[in-house]
Each structure stands twice: as structure tokens, then as C-alpha cells.
Amino acid sequence: MAIAHAVLRIARPTDRLQAIAAMYCQGLGFTRLGEFENHQGFDGVMVGHPQHGYHLEFTHHRGVKVGQAPTQDHLLVFYLPSEDDWRDGCCRMLAAGFRRVTAYNPYWDQSGQTFEDLDGYRVVLQQRGWEA
């Protein structure tokens, strides 16, 4: 199936475009993959790892306020089987300005830590592998 080879972009709005992009680059070790200004009233920054099949896009619609995350259960989850990588990742998240929070769904606290960005969106670092 062709979709199995597609690149995934996860896009969301923010009122703090540059701060959020910097936060995710520092916290998750992402790089800025691209950006645009005033594209029909929208500014945006794409961040991720250049060789991976996914990236994040943060956008800001000029003159529009989007506010905070709609719920505490909007998550990005990253599985890190190595305990050393997981601990390093947790330290990077805090250094980048993410706030450690208790997960809305207690499942994520069993083997991971949940972090909240400036907009209230959450990232979970799970200290385990992913098995489909």
C-alpha cells in the first residue's frame, strides 16, 4: 500500500511559534526542517529529524489567537527502550522548558514521564520499546 511509505506531518497551531519550535528542537533533539512567513496569512516552522518519516509543523495564523491545548490527553508519545536514552531525554525536556506533569491517563506514568509545553500540549517519553 502506497500510504505505508508516506511521510507523516503532524500540524498544530500555536500563538508562540518561535518559542514552541525552539522548545521542541531542544527537548527532542529535532532540527528546523523548514519554515515560511505570511503564506496567505500563516507563518510556520517544521521540525524533526531529516531522515525520519515524520515531522511536526507548528503554525500561526496572523491575527488569530488559538489559546491552549483543548484537553490534557493530546499527546505525542516517543518510545525509548534504552534507560540511558530515556533519562537523557527527560533531562533535555526539562532543560528546554517543558514542565513535568502527571499524565491524564495514568497508564503513561507506569513506564514514562509526561511533559507539557507552553501551549499545554503534552509529550510522553516512554521507557520501553514499541511492539505492534
Regions found by a protein language model. Name each.
Residues M1-I3, R9, E35, C90-A132:
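Vicinal oxygen chelate
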Residues Q51-L56, D119-V123:
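Short, charged/polar, Gly/Pro-enriched secondary-structure boundary elements
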Residues D84-G89:
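Short, conserved charged micro-motifs
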